């Protein structure tokens, strides 16, 4: 049976929009929500840990923590074309 499951992780991440006409051109941050949706067949193998599941929620959460949260939470992400911010961050 094909089904979908969804998990998310939230981060607090800083950035700026260098050429924006508003205050967004200044360094600031947001609360971001990253969502992963997985679609596939339910595991029908008898006796395995994931039996009756598409994937264990805890496994998805571990992946999201490792690949997203631990990378960008309380971090500052910089647009590669933002030479001014990149130069400033080189001195930190």
Place the predicted regions along the sequence by residue.
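Charge-rich, low-complexity N-terminal segments
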Residues: 1-92
